């Protein structure tokens, strides 16, 4: 049986530097000017691609 060497804090933290969240792609709504997620319906006015999808 082989005893493995303990992973040090530095090695563990260097490996985890790539585990991070990405910033969501925010764009300005062409109808109302609110910030919204790209390729999704605007929560403020309910429009998508210039058409009203959700009536507010």
From Swiss-Prot:
InterPro entries, per database record: Ribosomal_bL32 (IPR002677), Ribosomal_bL32_bact (IPR044957), Ribosomal_zn-bd (IPR011332)
GO biological process, one term: translation
Record bears the keyword Cytoplasm: no
GO cellular component terms given for this protein: cytosolic large ribosomal subunit
Keywords attached to this entry: Ribonucleoprotein, Ribosomal protein
Name of the protein in question: Large ribosomal subunit protein bL32
PANTHER family in alphabetical order: 50S RIBOSOMAL PROTEIN L32, LARGE RIBOSOMAL SUBUNIT PROTEIN BL32
GO molecular function, one term: structural constituent of ribosome
UniProt record similarity statement: Belongs to the bacterial ribosomal protein bL32 family.
């Amino acid at each position: 049986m082989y005893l493995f060497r303990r992973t040090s804090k530095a090695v563990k933290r260097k490996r985890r530097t790539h585990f991070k969240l990405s910033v969501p792609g925010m764009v300005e709504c062409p109808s109302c000017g609110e910030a919204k997620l790209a390729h999704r319906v605007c929560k403020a006015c309910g429009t998508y691609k210039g058409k009203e999808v959700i009536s507010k």
